[in-house]
UniProtKB/Swiss-Prot annotation:
Cellular localization per UniProt: Nucleus
Species per Swiss-Prot/TrEMBL record: Antirrhinum majus
Keywords, alphabetical: DNA-binding, Nucleus, Repeat, Transcription, Transcription regulation
Keyword Repeat (UniProt): yes
Full protein name: Myb-related protein 340
């Protein structure tokens, strides 16, 4: 069953990426009339977008005071400090970082937390394979350079090839196409020890 407009004021709503033309219409409308009720702005500006879509586009991308570029080290420290204090209250945190949006801060936090967990897992994995490295280098990624990666594979191969009575082939290098030398699941599976149970 197709949805039909309830009255003559309902218009087909456009979804998907914003065009440069739509951005310019919204910027010009707000510069001439100011911010206000976003549903009214969307309709009055002639945009076939929802008020929410217009508000988010303006606040997160088009506002003149939105900062561009990477989060600075000072901002990183402030985000960590404020997150420890207020948790995931991104809007409250954003008020202390002029020009940064709550969404940008949330995305930054989630992205860096995931990277931190991956690096901890790598260090733990390497420490399990070669225990002498676990105490000295557990807090840093052993895979941050190809030198470390090659050493890790040599240690891995020599640890198991010498102690196993079979001729298992292990990779002599890690793939260098992946970002920051993260292992793919295929790489990890290919390094699994054969099942001794048969």
């Amino acid at each position: 069953m197709d949805k039909k407009p309830c009255n003559s004021h309902d218009v087909e709503v456009r979804k998907g990426p914003w065009t440069m033309e739509e951005d310019l219409i919204l910027i010009n409308f707000i510069s001439n009339h100011g911010e206000g009720v976003w549903n009214t702005i969307a309709r009055s500006a002639g945009l076939k977008r929802t008020g929410k879509s217009c508000r988010l586009r303006w606040l997160n991308y088009l506002r003149p005071d939105v900062r561009r570029g990477n989060i600075t080290p000072e901002e990183q420290l402030l985000i960590m400090e404020l997150h420890a204090k207020w948790g995931n209250r991104w809007s409250k945190i954003a008020k202390h970082l002029p020009g940064r949006t709550d969404n940008e801060i949330k995305n930054y936090w989630n992205r860096t937390r995931i990277q931190k967990h991956i690096k901890q897992a790598e260090a733990s994995f390497i420490g399990h394979i070669n225990p002498e490295h676990s105490n000295e280098q557990a807090s840093t990624s052993l895979l941050s350079s190809s030198c470390h990666a090659d050493h890790a594979v040599e240690s891995y191969s020599s640890s198991f090839n010498g102690n196993m009575g079979n001729n298992v082939q292990y990779p002599n290098h890690f793939p260098t196409e992946s970002n920051d030398y993260f292992w793919s699941m295929e790489d990890l599976w290919s390094m699994q020890l054969p099942n001794n149970g048969g």
